[in-house]
Regions:
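Active-site acidic short loop of glycosyltransferases
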Residues: 77-79, 109, 133, 150
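Short pre-active-site segment immediately N-terminal to redox-active cysteine/selenocysteine motifs
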Residues: 79-81, 85-89, 152
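Soluble periplasmic/extracytoplasmic beta-strand elements of cell-envelope proteins
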Residues: 84, 114-116, 167
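Structural microenvironment flanking redox-active thiols in thiol-disulfide oxidoreductases
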Residues: 94-131, 140-146
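Thiol/disulfide oxidoreductase modules built on the thioredoxin-like
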Residues: 128-133, 139-187
């Protein structure tokens, strides 16, 4: 009789802990599904969402390049222009900038301009050398933040051949080359 009671007690405790484990396991499954869903959205869906043509004209911003000459956003007309806003202290920028630079070298028909925001020339120059960045423009006063609605780094703004902002991608995207390919093929016509 005593053994039967102990067996029932053990069975009840085991059942309770199994339910807790399954509930906790289900919670982790749900969390994993949400993370995977966000990653799919960030990498494959969001970069394919473009604003309607002619909605937002690009601001007539002018920045100095690292080597002294002026860069005018309006000079990008006739080509798809990617403005890559970053800061040297931004860890995700350090991961994404080399991907963007590699894509830029492979696609000379597009214009890619990395823009260092909020930092002086010497800091920007050191960072550009370290990461082998080309055509770097400077925005030491941070005017890009209100002009292009840059809220965080990295941020890439895509401007079509007619000078209209068609997309803005914020945050690290490991598949940024895929997003840039899609934008170039959509807007170079």
């Amino acid at each position: 009789m005593e053994a039967a009671k102990e067996s029932q007690l053990f069975s009840a405790r085991s059942s309770i802990s199994t339910r807790r484990l399954l509930t906790g396991g289900r919670l982790w499954d749900l969390l994993a599904a949400l993370v995977i869903g966000f990653a799919v959205w960030k990498i494959f869906i969001a970069p394919r969402s473009f604003e309607a043509a002619g909605t937002h004209p690009a601001p007539a911003a002018i920045y100095q390049r690292l080597h002294g000459e002026a860069f005018r956003v309006a000079d990008g007309r006739g080509r798809v222009l990617f403005l890559d806003f970053y800061a040297s202290w931004c860890e995700p920028c350090k991961l994404e900038l080399p991907l963007v630079e590699a894509w830029s070298r492979a696609h000379p028909d597009a214009a890619v301009v990395p823009i260092d925001v909020g930092e002086g020339r010497s800091v920007a120059a050191t960072f550009a050398r370290r990461y082998k960045l080309q055509n770097v423009a400077l925005d030491p006063n941070g005017s890009a933040r209100p002009l292009f609605a840059v809220e965080g780094f990295p941020t890439i703004v895509v401007i079509d051949r007619n000078g209209f902002i068609r997309a803005k991608w914020e945050g690290l995207n490991p598949a940024i080359a895929l997003a840039m390919d899609n934008a170039l093929s959509s807007f170079e016509r």
